Design a protein with these regions (language model features):
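Active-site cores of enzymes that catalyze phosphoryl transfer or operate on phosphate-rich substrates
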Residues: 249, 352-356, 456
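Short Cys/His-rich metal-coordination motifs, predominantly Zn2+-binding knuckles/fingers
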Residues: 183, 254, 354-355, 425-427
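A glycine-biased structural micro-motif
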Residues: 243-246, 312-325
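Short beta-alpha connecting loops at secondary-structure transitions
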Residues: 105-118, 307-318, 542-547, 571-578
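N-terminal, positively charged nucleic-acid-binding surface of large information/translation enzymes
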Residues: 1-237, 278-291, 295-309, 321, ...
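Extracellular/luminal Protease-associated
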Residues: 245-302
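Conserved active-site neighborhood of enzyme catalytic/cofactor-binding cores
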Residues: 2, 48-82, 97-99, 180-182, ...
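Short acidic, glycine-rich loop/turn motifs
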Residues: 206-212, 236, 250-255, 424-426
């Protein structure tokens, strides 16, 4: 029998594809729940269903694959659980753009028909990222692939919401949110891009009530919000304003009196030392307002136009926020109430997808009591039950968790897990697993059957992805896989989602899995930058496409390069020169094997 011979020239494209299919067909990547071998689990961070492979993906999935392959070869029963995230806003935007190209508006189509369009899009295009991961050589257990909107995970989300609501951990509250007036939804802090820019700051004069010619000066970059001011704050130790504390200032244009309050939020060495407090349009002002019992005056509509309310003079009602700014400044100037204008460096929040300026906006939303959930999650890391590698990331985790704020989980979208809440005729809320249970609960409450209206909002995608380590294993059912593969051995991820995903998995996992952590280690890897150490971006033209690199150099060359350069704590400066070197190395290995 003739021994097969290796080709003279190493062709990674054909060789890698052939071996990958061989391993896949043989079930080499599958876990073995009935095995007596010790299990080893990695939960794949689910990429967005809209996504395509980028260098960050290439790094994190290469590192995960190395760990899985090593432990598989060492005889462990390995589970690398794959899946994709439904990516609420991103997916809805993709399908909306496709419909817009056909001159179809989402709202004209209607909710049910629009959601059906999204499912059609997913069936056609939603699996792209996993096909690309296979080209990278990722040896995940693909037969166990999950989606955060599949039936099993949806059931887990509903149970979680209902149970947490009954435990008092989910509640409805009127608070400030990051409102995107273009997408017309609240968005998370992760979806807000803070952009430094030069802005005008205007110094305005508010007259002191009961005086002829005494004013207090405040500075603002957003004069259009002054109509919603609830107070002027001064530092309690500022001697300049001691005589004014407790008195009233007259709000220009609307002539509404507002109190002058003492609060340490006002800094004596910043500006005039006096600050306008607009609780409904600034996150810091909101907290000051709560301390002093100030009113919440929502000045704007969902599209960021001025509301038609008594607090806003009629001439400004209906104006876009920036048109209102110009008109208000002109009127203040005409009354001699603008002291001066200066140009300052300012950080302005923008929606990372819409590109528009975010408006802090007061509205009723659903919240999670994250402070309560964080307590055991903090303790678990303090006790070393979950370890961060490198260890310095403990500090980042602790700082955020110990200062955690209520988590806004409702989104004004159509695509996502719809909130299981129904409202009675008087606004009474009924949170149940399904409509039938809600109708029964309402009938008991009212003594008769009444019509109910379901909540229109969906859940933040981080809510469902926070359940990923155990919902993918069959929870809430107590499956054999759940008992065998939970908790995971290691989570591999970047530092940028410690707050948004790692922390939420810790909180949710420990709450629903009897205090057991979701993973024993969290390996935080570096970022992939260009060869000069700059962040890759399309605008800079320095983006390296991993799929193009795989075509040119082979998947093993790319994986070898990333693994070799992934030293702890140092960002990877990626260059094609490095790739060429490791491609040559793989060729040498091939030639050595031919020689043998």
């Amino acid at each position: 029998m003739t021994e097969p011979t290796l080709a003279k020239t190493y062709d990674p494209k054909s060789i890698e594809a052939n071996w990958y299919e061989t391993w896949l067909d043989s079930g080499h990547f599958a876990c073995a729940p009935d095995s007596k071998a010790t299990p080893y689990t990695i939960m794949m961070p689910p990429p967005n269903v809209t996504g395509s492979l980028h260098m960050g993906h290439a790094l994190t999935f290469t590192l995960q694959d190395l760990l899985i392959r090593y432990h598989r070869m060492a005889g462990r029963d390995t589970l690398w659980q794959p899946g994709t995230d439904h990516a609420g806003i991103a997916t809805q935007m993709v399908v909306e753009r496709q419909l817009a190209a056909q001159n179809i508006a989402r709202r004209d189509l209607g909710r049910d028909a629009f959601i059906e369009k999204i499912w059609e899009w997913k069936a056609e295009s939603g699996g792209m990222i996993h096909k690309q991961l296979r080209r990278l050589g990722a040896s995940a257990d693909w037969q166990r692939e999950r989606f955060t909107m599949d039936d099993g995970l949806s059931a887990a989300v509903i149970k979680t919401f209902v149970q947490m609501h009954r435990e008092g951990l989910i509640y409805r509250d009127k608070r400030l949110v990051n409102w995107d007036p273009k997408l017309m939804t609240a968005i998370s802090d992760l979806e807000v891009e803070q952009i430094e820019q030069k802005s005008s700051m205007w110094h305005l004069k508010y007259k002191i009530e009961g005086t002829e010619n005494e004013y207090i000066s405040i500075a603002t970059t957003r004069p259009e919000t002054m109509l919603g001011d609830g107070a002027v704050a001064v530092n309690p130790d500022d001697e300049r304003y001691q005589h004014l504390i407790g008195k009233m200032a007259i709000l220009p244009l609307s002539n509404r009196p507002i109190p002058i309050v003492a609060d340490e939020y006002a800094k004596m060495d910043k500006g005039s030392g006096a600050v306008k407090i607009t609780p409904a349009h600034d996150f810091n002002d909101f907290e000051v307002g709560r301390r002093h019992g100030l009113p919440l005056i929502n000045l704007m509509t969902a599209t960021a136009s001025m509301e038609s309310i008594p607090e806003i003079p009629e001439k400004y009602q209906g104006l876009d926020r920036y048109d209102a700014r110009r008109q208000i400044l002109a009127d203040l100037d005409a009354q001699g109430l603008v002291e001066r204008e200066e140009i300052v460096e300012n950080v302005v929040p923008h929606g990372d997808r819409s590109g528009v300026v975010i408006e802090p906006w007061v509205m009723d939303q659903w919240y999670v009591n994250a402070e309560e959930l964080a307590k055991p999650a903090i303790k678990a890391v303090e006790e070393g039950r979950t370890k961060f590698v490198p260890e310095r990331w403990n500090k980042t985790y602790f700082e955020w968790m110990r200062n955690i704020q209520p988590w806004c989980i409702s989104r004004q979208l159509w695509w996502g897990h719809r909130i299981p809440a129904w409202y009675g005729p008087d606004g009474q809320v009924f949170v149940e697993a399904n409509e039938a249970d809600a109708i029964d609960a309402a009938a008991k409450h009212y003594g008769k059957t009444v019509p109910l209206t379901r909540d229109e909002d969906v859940l933040d995608t981080w809510f469902s992805s926070g359940l990923w380590p155990f919902s993918t294993l069959g929870w809430p059912d107590q499956t054999a896989e759940l008992k065998r593969y939970y908790p995971g051995d290691v989570l591999v991820t970047g530092f940028d989602i410690i707050f948004f995903w790692v922390a939420r998995m810790m909180m949710m996992g420990m709450h629903f899995m009897d205090g057991e952590v979701p993973f024993r280690e969290v390996y935080i890897h570096a970022l992939v930058r260009d060869e000069k150490g700059q962040k890759m971006s399309k605008s800079k033209g320095n983006v390296l496409d991993p799929l193009e690199l795989i075509d040119q150099y082979g998947a093993d060359s790319l994986r070898f390069t990333l693994a070799a350069m992934a030293a702890q704590g140092r960002d990877i400066k990626m260059s094609t020169t490095r790739l060429e070197g490791y491609r040559n190395f793989t060729t040498k290995i091939w030639n050595a094997c031919r020689f043998l």
